[in-house]
Amino acid sequence: MWVKSCILLSLLAVATYGQAHLKYTKEANDPEYVERHVHSQGHGHAHGGHGHAHDADGGCPYAKAAAAEAAAAAAHGHAHDHDHGHAHDHGHAHDHGHAHDHHGHSHDEEDIHDHDHGHAHEHHGHSHGDHGHFHGAEQTRKAAKQVASEYQYTGALSFLNDAKTRLWVYGISATLLISAAPCFILMFIPIQANTSESGPLLKVLLAFGSGGLLGDAFLHLIPHATPAGDGHGHSHSHGHSHGGAGGHSHGAHDMSVGGWVLAGIIAFLTVEKLVRILRGGEGHGHSHGHSHGGEKKETKETKDKDSKDKDSKKEKECKKDEQTIKVTAYLNLAADFAHNFTDGLAIGASFIAGTTVGVVTMITVLVHEVPHEIGDFAILIQSGYSKKKAMLIQLVTALGALSGCVISLLATDADALADAAASSWVLPFTAGGFIYIATVSVIPELLENSSFFQTIKEIFALLTGIFLMYLIAIYE
């Protein structure tokens, strides 16, 4: 009897296990069940304790089946509950994408492989980052090498590798170039001396020079002597005309600039008057000798007393005119020397600020000096100098620019020195001298013995000189 009972229990256990296994297999291969189970998170959490225990053992189906068999041997109801939990846990395993794989070991390998692959990917990304860092460092080294080799000279120019030496060479060379370039242009002017044949062209050049002097004074020197914020300060002074020391101070500064311009005019007038008094009736009629040589011979050969008196009067008048023009030439050279001195200060300070700034300043000063030097050349020719001698005297004024450049390069604060010179009495005083030379000494020469067509050319030349200075003032 008990043997039959044991056999019956064994058959019941086998049937229960087979039913559970069949249920497991069916549920695992049923897509609808899997989909329902994946979305039913609440039911899974109800068996969370048991399910997590199965997750801890690696999610192996055989381990779960063994546990189900042991539970079935204890009680039928618990076996059913566990089977249901097992099925749910298996559904959880299906979330990993391995619901159809009954080999949990292979799943672990795949999971490990995935992890290793992710790690390898991260490592690859890290390597890529390292490569990017290396690429950036390489670019930095190339840029540094390019900057370092920008001023690398070899051979005869190797001395320019020293920054201080290079600064001096650039500054002095730029100053010499500015002084020599106008002389190169003067070589092509078809005037050799002050003769009657070259008179019309010389007057046109004098008109051009006077326009350059006036434009330089009113459009360059005087504006540079006035502070940059002058317009704003002026309106502010008018707005507070009853109140303040600030407006009074600005008005005093305006008066000082105009006062120095007047001082320059009066100083040049005084010097010319003193030279005339000291030299008296003496005159160096070098130019007169060229233009009136025939009249001299005629005076010596003629025995008529009236003719001698007329010729002597004409000669004295010409000598006085030449004497006046000579004094004007000297005064113009003095003013040009002072002007070139301030240009030299600006060139030195600009090269200290940088090579590019220095080159731009050099070009600006060069364009500014060309019409100015042509006018000086015409005044020197008019005063009796030959073309060669006038060009050599023009080079003497370059000493002013050289001295200004040297002082600027030696100064501890070249920018402050250049700004101080620009805002001091030097520029307005020089402007007054240029105004005096143009209006008192040069323009009166244009009023004598000119035809209508010659007058048109002279006025056009005068306006051209002013317009060139205007263009330079705009783009400076």
UniProtKB/Swiss-Prot annotation:
One of its GO terms (molecular function) is zinc ion transmembrane transporter activity. It is a multi-pass membrane protein. GO terms for cellular component: membrane. Keywords: Glycoprotein, Ion transport, Membrane, Transmembrane, Transmembrane helix, Transport, Zinc, Zinc transport. The chain crosses the membrane at residues 2-22, 171-191, 204-224, 255-275, 347-367, 390-410, 424-444, 455-475. Residues 78-98, 106-119, 127-141, 292-319 have a biased composition (Basic and acidic residues). Glycans are attached at N194, N340, N449. Belongs to the ZIP transporter (TC 2.A.5) family. KE4/Catsup subfamily. This is Zinc transporter zipt-7.2. The gene is zipt-7.2.
